[in-house]
Amino acid sequence: IDITGDSATVDNKGGMTVTDPDSIGILIDGDKAIVNNDGDNAISNGGTGTQINGDEATVNNNGNTTVDGQGSTGTEIAGNNVVVNQDGTLDVSGGGHGIDITGDSATVDNKGGMTVTDPDSIGILIDGDKAIVNNDGDNAISNGGTGTQVNGDEATVNNNGNTTVDGQGSTGTEIAGNNAVVNQDGTLDVSGGGHGIDITGDSATVDNKGGMTVTDPDSIGILIDGDKAIVNNDGDNAISNGGTGTQVNGDEATVNNNGKTTVDGQGSTGTEIAGNNAVVNQDGTLDVSGGGHGIDITGDSATVDNKGGMTVTDPDSI
């Protein structure tokens, strides 16, 4: 289907299979397009399911979407103020992209859950400022894949479902831009050297209410590279076997650990900050064993308020 013009509507109820480079299932050049994909979509080997070039587009993917292979994309939009509603599941592998948006003020509502695996695979990719992503279903990211990636300022990502990240190079939520906000209401489980939340930019805020489990060397629950970061860990955090719960590289960071923090094992760290004028408020209890570190700060003028009590046992535990 190839439409040039504004205010086009496509109702695709029968499902769609698109394969090979330059193959496109639905192509619209124009503003205010609406596409309803009610059937299941299977995109592979460099094909594109739905492509829209224009502002104020809306794509409703009510069926399940499977994307596999380098250059393959389920939904691709170039334009501002676009909306993608992913009610069906999203399964991305082999370096494909599930949803790819270039433009400001994009909104993605992902209710169906997301599975992303393999290097270069991305579930949701947005290049533009003021993006909003709502992940209401559970997300499983592995083997070098990325769940949600936003390149732009003032991004907001709400992870209401549970997030599981496993493997080197795997990332649940990745943002490059200033004034980013991530709300992690579901649980966050990171292992095998993956990163749960990875933000590069100043004035980032992470509200982690769902609790966090991080295990294995190089695994990091929350990683922020930038100044004036704020992290609120309201749920319980369990860090073990060389993992790191929260790591901030930048000045004037504030980390509020309101839940219980348990750290066990050599190389394991609950909260790690490299920067000056850092503040850590430990209101929940802190339990450190096996040679782990509860709070580790490198920098001048650091402040730690430990109100929750502390239990430290075993050699090298701090």
Predicted regions and their residues:
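Thr-biased low-complexity repeat/linker tracts and other Thr-enriched repetitive architectures
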Residues: 1-318
